[in-house]
C-alpha cells in the first residue's frame, strides 16, 4: 500500500491526540530498554565469574558485552524500521476514498452545526445592527456628558446670581442701596423698558447707519465727484451718534460741545473713506428677552 498522506496523518493526530509515528517510537524505545537491561544483567553475571584461576578477564568481558550491545542495537533498528513502515502504511492510515467521502467526525465536531449562506448573512446583519446600536449609545452618552457639563456651568452661574440677589435683598441697613432698590422698582418693568429702548436703538441704527447705506453713499459720492457732501454725511452720523449717547447718559455737556464742533474738511473726507461700521446683532436682544 502507498504511504500515508498529510490529510490522513493530520486526522489521526487530531483524533488520537499525538502523532502516529510516536506510537512506533514508543515501541522501539521499549524494546531497546529491555535489551539494555539484558546486556547489563549479562555483564554483571560474567563479571562475577571473571576470575579463572589467577587470571582476571573483566576487561575482556566489558569489551565483549559492549560489542554485543552494538550488534543488538543494529538488529533492533533494522527490524523495527520494517515494523515502522508496515504500521504506518497498513495500520495507522486512512484510505483515500474515506477521506474524499468525509465519513469521519471527530470528537470536537459532534455538536458542529453547518450554517448556510442565508443564515450567515442574517447573523452578519444582526451583528452589524448591534454594532450600530453600540456606536449610537456611545454618541448619546457623549452628548449627555456635554449637556451635563453645560448644565453644571449654568447651575454655577445661577447660584452666583442667586447669591448676589440675596445680598441685594438683604441690604436693609444700607440706606444708599435701599434708595437704588426703590428707584428700580418694579424691576420687571424696568428691565422691559431697557430692552425695548435698546431694541429701538438697534433698529434705528440699522435703518439710518447700516453698512449698505454708507457704502452706497460713498459710491455715489465717488461717481458724482461731490466731495463736499462727505462733510454733511459725517455731521449727520455725528449728530445721530451724539443723540444715542445722550439718551444712554454717556455723553456730558463738554463732550457734547466737542462732538458738535466742525472738523476739518480733509479729515472728514479721509475718515469717511475708512469708515467700517459693523452690522447690529439684533439676536443679542432675543437672549435678553
From Swiss-Prot:
Cytoplasm in keyword set: yes
Lineage: Eukaryota, Fungi, Dikarya, Ascomycota, Saccharomycotina
Function: Acts as an essential component of the kinetochore MIND complex, which is required for the spindle checkpoint and kinetochore integrity. MIND plays a role in establishing a bipolar spindle-kinetochore interaction by joining kinetochore subunits contacting DNA to those contacting microtubules.
Coiled-coil residues: 105-147
Name the record gives this protein: Kinetochore-associated protein MTW1
Pfam (any one): Mis12
InterPro entries associated with the record: Centromere_Mis12 (IPR008685)
Gene name linked to the record: MTW1
Misc. remarks from the entry: Present with 2610 molecules/cell in log phase SD medium.
UniProt organism field: Saccharomyces cerevisiae (strain ATCC 204508 / S288c)
Amino acid at each position: 500500500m502507498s504511504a500515508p498522506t498529510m490529510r490522513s496523518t493530520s486526522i489521526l493526530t487530531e483524533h488520537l491526540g499525538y502523532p502516529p509515528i510516536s506510537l512506533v517510537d514508543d515501541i522501539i524505545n521499549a524494546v531497546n530498554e529491555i535489551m539494555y537491561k539484558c546486556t547489563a544483567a549479562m555483564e554483571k553475571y560474567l563479571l562475577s565469574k571473571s576470575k579463572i584461576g589467577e587470571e582476571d578477564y573483566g576487561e575482556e568481558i566489558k569489551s565483549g558485552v559492549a560489542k554485543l550491545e552494538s550488534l543488538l542495537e543494529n538488529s533492533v533498528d533494522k527490524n523495527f524500521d520494517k515494523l515502522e513502515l508496515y504500521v504506518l502504511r497498513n495500520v495507522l492510515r486512512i484510505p483515500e476514498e474515506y477521506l474524499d467521502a468525509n465519513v469521519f467526525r471527530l470528537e470536537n465536531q459532534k455538536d458542529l452545526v453547518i450554517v448556510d449562506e442565508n443564515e450567515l448573512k442574517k447573523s452578519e446583519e444582526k451583528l452589524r445592527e448591534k454594532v450600530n446600536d453600540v456606536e449610537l449609545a456611545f454618541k448619546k452618552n457623549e452628548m449627555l456628558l456635554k449637556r451635563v457639563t453645560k448644565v453644571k456651568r449654568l447651575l454655577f452661574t445661577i447660584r452666583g446670581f442667586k447669591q448676589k440677589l440675596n445680598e441685594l435683598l438683604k441690604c436693609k441697613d444700607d440706606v444708599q442701596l435701599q434708595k437704588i432698590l426703590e428707584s428700580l422698582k418694579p424691576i420687571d418693568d424696568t428691565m422691559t423698558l431697557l430692552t425695548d429702548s435698546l431694541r429701538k436703538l438697534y433698529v434705528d441704527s440699522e435703518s439710518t447707519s447700516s453698512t449698505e447705506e454708507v457704502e452706497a453713499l460713498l459710491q455715489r459720492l465717488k461717481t458724482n465727484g461731490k466731495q463736499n457732501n462727505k462733510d454733511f454725511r459725517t455731521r449727520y452720523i455725528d449728530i445721530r451718534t451724539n443723540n444715542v449717547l445722550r439718551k444712554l447718559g454717556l455723553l456730558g455737556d463738554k463732550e457734547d460741545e466737542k462732538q458738535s464742533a466742525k472738523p476739518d474738511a480733509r479729515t472728514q473726507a479721509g475718515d469717511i473713506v475708512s469708515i467700517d461700521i459693523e452690522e447690529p446683532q439684533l439676536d443679542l436682544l432675543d437672549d435678553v428677552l
